[in-house]
């Protein structure tokens, strides 16, 4: 029963990938790379010079604390990195960029490829602190597919009414 939506979700992911990824290749962009910080007490959202709701900051800080103190990757870090990168993709003025914007990430660096603007309306550049060096992800298709699957998961199921 749960597989009924898999076809439309796959089609949505495929469509969005070509609309947002392939359409933005080849533009004249500037690459900004945010490398790791040596101070492990600086959390991911606090290290970013961007203001977001405090509950996101708490989740990010808890995930980073877990990784730093145990050495194990915490799955929440990956998901929150995706969420943050998608915010940059959706609102490029956060990092003084104009569209098109591409975001790439690994454990030690988040790369924003965009046309840089000197506007004062943006909130500045970003810095992150990651641990797992093997994490290499292309953000947008992963995040869009994840949210599409999440949306489908919480959609109300059709109910059969007996006669």
Curated annotation (Swiss-Prot):
One of its GO terms (cellular component) is viral envelope. Heterotrimer of GP2b, GP3, and GP4; disulfide-linked. The GP2b-GP3-GP4 complex associates with the E protein. Minor envelope protein. Part of the glycoproteins heterotrimer GP2b-GP3-GP4 which is probably responsible for the attachment to target host cell. This attachment induces virion internalization predominantly through clathrin-dependent endocytosis. N-glycosylation for overlapping sequons occurs at both Asn-28 and Asn-29, and blocks cleavage of the signal peptide between Gly-26 and Ser-27. Changing residue 28 to H: Not glycosylated, no cleavage of the signal peptide. Not glycosylated, allows cleavage of the signal peptide. The keyword Secreted applies. It is found in: Virion membrane; Host endoplasmic reticulum membrane; Host Golgi apparatus membrane; Secreted. Pfam families: GP3 (PF03076). It is a peripheral membrane protein. Residues 1-26 form the signal peptide. Residues 142-158 are annotated as: Important for peripheral membrane localization. Glycans are attached at residues 28-29, 49, 96, 106, 118. Changing residue 29 to H: Not glycosylated, no cleavage of the signal peptide. Not glycosylated; allows cleavage of the signal peptide. Belongs to the arteriviridae GP3 protein family. This is Glycoprotein 3. Keywords: Clathrin-mediated endocytosis of virus by host, Disulfide bond, Glycoprotein, Host endoplasmic reticulum, Host Golgi apparatus, Host membrane, Host-virus interaction, Membrane, Secreted, Signal, Viral attachment to host cell, Viral envelope protein, Viral penetration into host cytoplasm, Virion, Virus endocytosis by host, Virus entry into host cell. GO terms for biological process: clathrin-dependent endocytosis of virus by host cell; virion attachment to host cell. It comes from the Viruses.
